[in-house]
């Protein structure tokens, strides 16, 4: 309860600090100190001072909300409510609901029952699946609505105050609804399948669950550029023939095959700049923000793309997918051990009781927090590899330096952070380190 109140009130607290309200008066220009050290812009520092506590709060409060929901008995109450709903029993305060529930939920149970192979129907029923699905959807909707004020403040109001958002409030809300819908479908499939496996294979479920985890993550990587991204952006093939020729020449020097190049209309949402490689196999493609094409020189764009090609060359996406899959698979065995020893204390009917989902999500969140230093260290290593590849292939250290100076201004990025913050939170090396790498590369080339 306390954690939920913190989530609801924290946007007001951040607003009362006045940081966002004064952002328009701050300069976004970086400067150099007398000793030659690059200094972050006042606006970037203000944004960082706002985002850091918000990020820490989001990390820590979310699992506490879930634990509170579990230990208070509310999770058990929600499961009982969902069971009554699935059985078409009367719900308090809902007039005329039983007949409607029997008709519509009866159809749902029938459809879900037909999804179960006959050999499995003695261990898992259509009602089991329906209860799990309804519980998951309601929990996801409840937590999303709880975080809606926080999300709206952080990703819309703050973005407008600091001048990098180009969205209207209705457009932001529509994106939020689409994102929630995708999450409901994905979580519904994943967690309903998870609880079905717990019923079918009480002892061996981590083995098929791990395989499914790796397979589903591969499917997500494959379909995201084709099905998900177009829901949020207008996408069109790169039309600039001269830039296409430069990209193809760059890829040829890097020993890579590139055929699909696309541009997304990031300018419809923000002024932020980026480019990335995505997908596997035939879905693999280069994606450029239109903000990159309109505000940067061809040499700077080439440096960005060379960096992204470095990720491709070193197979960072593939290695990340395999590493995350292996870690997740091992984690499933740890989760089995934990569930077998804690379900009775939580008042659950067994490990396969969907009422234990908040507990599972909280455990996953805490483990993810503990893993941040290792995960982000590997990410920074990969980014340094890609930076070095970019310099080695493009041979444009001056453009590299100019690029990151512009990034610091346009993306309102601080150029350096305390070491503890870099270790725990940063997925990329500080901008000063990346510029220093380019300066060292230029000095070595001039020798």
Regions found by a protein language model. Give the residues of each.
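Polar-ligand-bearing catalytic/cofactor-coordination segments
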Residues: 2-4, 11-93, 100, 104-352, ...
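N-terminal signal-anchor/signal peptide hydrophobic helix marking the start
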Residues: 352-360
């Amino acid at each position: 309860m306390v954690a939920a109140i913190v989530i609801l009130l924290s946007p007001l607290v951040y607003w009362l600090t006045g940081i966002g309200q004064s952002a328009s008066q701050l300069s976004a220009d970086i400067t150099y100190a007398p000793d030659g050290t690059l200094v972050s812009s006042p606006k970037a520092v203000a944004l960082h001072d706002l985002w850091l506590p918000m990020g820490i709060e989001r990390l820590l409060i979310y699992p506490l909300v879930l634990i509170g929901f579990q230990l208070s008995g509310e999770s058990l109450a929600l499961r009982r409510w969902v069971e009554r709903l699935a059985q078409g029993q009367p719900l308090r305060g809902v007039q005329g609901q039983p007949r409607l529930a029997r008709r519509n939920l009866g159809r749902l149970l029938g459809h879900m029952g037909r999804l179960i192979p006959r050999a499995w129907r003695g261990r898992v029923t259509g009602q089991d699946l329906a209860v799990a699905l309804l519980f998951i959807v309601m929990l996801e909707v409840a937590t999303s609505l709880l975080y809606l004020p926080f999300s709206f403040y952080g990703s819309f109001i703050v973005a407008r105050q600091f001048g990098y958002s180009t969205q209207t409030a209705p457009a932001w809300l529509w994106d939020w609804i689409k994102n929630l819908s995708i999450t409901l479908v994905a979580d519904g499939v994943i967690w309903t399948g998870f609880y079905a496996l717990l019923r079918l294979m009480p002892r061996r479920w981590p083995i098929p669950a791990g395989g499914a985890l790796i397979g589903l993550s591969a499917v997500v990587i494959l379909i995201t550029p084709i099905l998900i991204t177009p829901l949020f952006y207008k996408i069109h093939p790169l039309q600039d023939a001269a830039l296409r020729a430069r990209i193809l020449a760059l890829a040829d020097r890097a020993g890579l095959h590139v055929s699909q190049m696309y541009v997304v209309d990031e300018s419809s949402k923000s002024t932020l700049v980026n480019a990335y490689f995505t997908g596997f196999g035939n879905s693999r493609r280069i994606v450029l923000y239109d903000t990159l094409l309109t505000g940067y020189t061809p040499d700077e764009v080439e440096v960005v793309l060379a960096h992204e090609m470095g990720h491709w060359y070193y197979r960072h996406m593939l290695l990340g997918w395999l590493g995350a899959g292996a870690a997740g698979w091992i984690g499933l065995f740890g989760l089995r051990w934990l569930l077998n020893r804690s379900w009775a204390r939580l008042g659950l009917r067994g490990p396969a009781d969907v009422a234990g989902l908040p507990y599972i999500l909280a455990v996953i969140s805490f483990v993810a927090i503990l893993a941040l230093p290792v995960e982000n260290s590997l990410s920074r290593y990969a980014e340094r590899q890609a930076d070095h590849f970019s310099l080695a292939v493009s041979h444009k250290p001056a453009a590299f330096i100019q690029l990151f100076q512009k990034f610091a201004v346009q993306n309102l990025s601080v150029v350096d952070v305390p070491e503890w913050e870099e270790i725990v939170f940063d997925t990329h090396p500080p901008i000063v380190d990346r510029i220093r790498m380019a300066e060292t590369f230029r000095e070595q080339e001039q020798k």
